[in-house]
From Swiss-Prot:
PANTHER family reported for this sequence: JACALIN-RELATED LECTIN 2-RELATED, JACALIN-RELATED LECTIN 3
Gene Ontology cellular component terms for the protein in this record: cytoplasm
Main location: cytoplasm
Protein name per its UniProtKB record: Inactive protein RESTRICTED TEV MOVEMENT 1
Species in which this protein is naturally found: Arabidopsis thaliana
Alphabetical GO biological process terms: defense response
PROSITE patterns assigned: JACALIN_LECTIN (PS51752)
Gene behind the chain: RTM1
Keywords in alphabetical order: Cytoplasm, Lectin, Plant defense
Localization of this protein: Cytoplasm
Length: 174
């Protein structure tokens, strides 16, 4: 299930590049972020596929005065949400201004910059490991849009009826 993307881009930009990292099994090992006071410049991922580490392409220019690596505790830690802010007006800057990643055990960020003229977004993916990847766009000025993939559950949780039967057998009438 594709969610988003959110963000905005400068209509004057002629270098918009779409990217999609949704074909992976959802196991992210690391996230690499280049950012600064202008916002999120680029994002890159390292996935676990068939027991091997696979590095995605970098999505956006490798500039910005800060660089962060988010390393998840694979296989026990997984993405449960992403939130942030994007600039809603035309400008020659990265419109994705800040990003924060939530997992089942931790919170990473926010990375980038915050401001009162930014719109906020939040994708909450539930407590289960349902994250399926990222997608978005970038141009020469930085990350413009970002979205996520959600893998809906395919199996109902099992209901433990053993305790219910035990409780019923202990009921005494009259």
């Amino acid at each position: 299930m594709k969610i988003g993307p959110v963000g905005k881009h400068d209509a004057r930009s002629t270098t918009i590049v779409n990217w999609d990292e949704g074909s992976h099994d959802g196991f992210i090992y690391q996230i690499f972020l280049s950012h600064g006071v202008a916002g999120i410049m680029s994002i890159q991922f390292q996935f676990v596929m068939d027991g091997k580490l696979v590095l995605s392409d970098r999505h956006g220019p490798c500039s910005g005065d800060m660089f962060d690596v988010i390393e998840l505790n694979y296989p026990h830690e997984y993405i449960t949400g992403i939130s942030g802010e994007y600039y809603k007006y035309e400008a020659n800057i990265p419109h994705m201004r800040s990003l924060k990643f939530n997992t089942n055990t931790s919170e990473y960020g926010p990375f980038g910059t915050s401001g009162s003229s930014n719109d906020k977004f939040a994708f909450k993916l539930g407590k289960s490991p349902q994250f399926g990847g990222f997608h978005g766009t970038y141009d020469a000025s930085g990350l413009q849009y970002i979205g996520v993939y959600l893998r809906p559950k395919t199996v109902l949780p099992k209901i433990d009826t053993g305790n219910a039967e035990e409780t019923e057998s202990k009921i005494v009438l009259g």
